[in-house]
Amino acid sequence: MVVVSRDITERIKYDEEIRNLAFYDTLTQLPNRRLLNDRLDQAMAASKRSGLYGALMFFDLDNFKSLNDTHGHSVGDLLLVEVAHRINHCVREVDTVARLGGDEFVVVFSELDVDKAKSATQASIVAEKIRAVLAEPYMLRIQHEGKAETTIEHHCTSSIGAVLFINHEASSEDIIKWADMAMYQAKEAGGNLIQFSDSKA
C-alpha cells in the first residue's frame, strides 16, 4: 500500500514537472509563449462576450545586451528574474505576465472598459507604472570564478508596445505582432517609451 501511494505521488510530481516545462519559462517561472497564446485567446473571447476592451503590452529591455556582454549570461538571468518580479507586482491577479524569450515580456490585460478611450487610459496608467519600475536601478550580486562576491548596479529601461482589442477578427498572433511593431517604434524613438498600435483589433 505504501509503495503504491509513493508511486502515485511520484507520478503526479512527474506529470506536474512535464506540464511546467510545457507551459512555463524555466528561468522566471512565467507562462511561456504557448500558455500566453492560450491565455490571450481566452481574454479575446471574454472581451467579445462582455463588450469590455482588453489590452496586450509587449516589453523589450533597452540595454540588456551590454549587461550580458560585460558580465555574462548568468548575471543577465538575474536581471530577467528581477524584471519578471517587478512586472508581476504591477498587475492584477487576473492579468497574465509571460516571457517570450530573451529580454521580451508580454502582459495581457482583460476587462478594462466598454469605452475605448477609458480603456486606453487604464492601460496607459499601468504601462507607465511598469515602465517607471523597470527603470529603477537593479542591484545584482555577481561572483566571477576565484573572486569574492560583489554587487553591481545596473540601469535598464524598456520599450513598450501596446494594442487594445475587443470584438474583432484578428488572431492572437496578429495582436502580438501589432504590439511588437509598436514596441519597435518606441525603441526607434529612443526607448523608455510606451507606444500604442494604430492597428484595428
Where are these regions (language model features)?
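Sensory coupling linkers of modular signal transduction proteins
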Residues: 7-20
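Cyclic nucleotide signaling catalytic output domains
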Residues: 97, 143-153, 159-189, 195-201
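Catalytic core regions of nucleotide second-messenger enzymes
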Residues: 99, 117-119, 123, 134-158
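PAS-family sensory domains
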Residues: 1-7
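Conserved long alpha-helical elements within nucleotide-processing catalytic cores of c-di-GMP signaling
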Residues: 19-23, 29-55, 62-92, 98-102, ...
